[in-house]
Amino acid sequence: MTAITITDAAHDYLADLLEKQNTPGIGIRVFITQPGTQYAETCIAYCKPGEEKPEDKAIGLKSFTAWIDGFSEAFLDDAVVDYATDRMGGQLTIKAPNAKVPMVNADSPINERINYYLQTEINPGLASHGGQVTLIDVVEEETKNIAVLQFGGGCQGCGQADVTLKEGIERTLLERIPELSGVRDVTDHTQKENAYY
């Protein structure tokens, strides 16, 4: 069974759009840009025969094939594509509750686990100050994994950023991810116009 549901109304609407393309075998491709981050966007695009990727999963629907991006599939768990009519005609909607915050486990790559905790535990607290922190990279230094982070919004230039980094973010991440040894801030804190403190 697939992780995504395409309602009958959405199917019929998409089938009508695809028919107008005059391309035999055309389907759709569902994917997420920047999955597992606060910037995640769920997308549907036309997919002509041969445009699907090898890792895509094919879902044969009544009138066309929906290709689910292999990398996005886990983030599309419980997603629903629907079409609702209104006075202006109608609107296609995509609800993907797991697009921004994937479920991770101990076997997930370290960057996915770091992003998970940033999105679920750390950024909600920073948001009260208009700030957020983003994972830039995970680097290995002397066999130790270091998370390279960047502050944004109200955290950039904030006089308390170093305390937040060491006392809040680093402590939380080290408790949750045993193979992580530390964090590093690469933010230019000389820019203070949006700083909270």
UniProtKB/Swiss-Prot annotation:
One of its GO terms (molecular function) is iron ion binding. GO terms for biological process: iron-sulfur cluster assembly; protein maturation. Gene3D superfamilies: Fe-S cluster assembly (FSCA), HesB-like domain. Binds 1 [4Fe-4S] cluster per subunit. The cluster is presumably bound at the interface of two monomers. It comes from the Bacteria. [4Fe-4S] cluster binds at C155, C158. Involved in iron-sulfur cluster biogenesis. Binds a 4Fe-4S cluster, can transfer this cluster to apoproteins, and thereby intervenes in the maturation of Fe/S proteins. Could also act as a scaffold/chaperone for damaged Fe/S proteins. Its cofactor is [4Fe-4S] cluster. Pfam families: Fe-S_biosyn, NifU. Keywords: 4Fe-4S, Iron, Iron-sulfur, Metal-binding. This is Fe/S biogenesis protein NfuA. Homodimer.
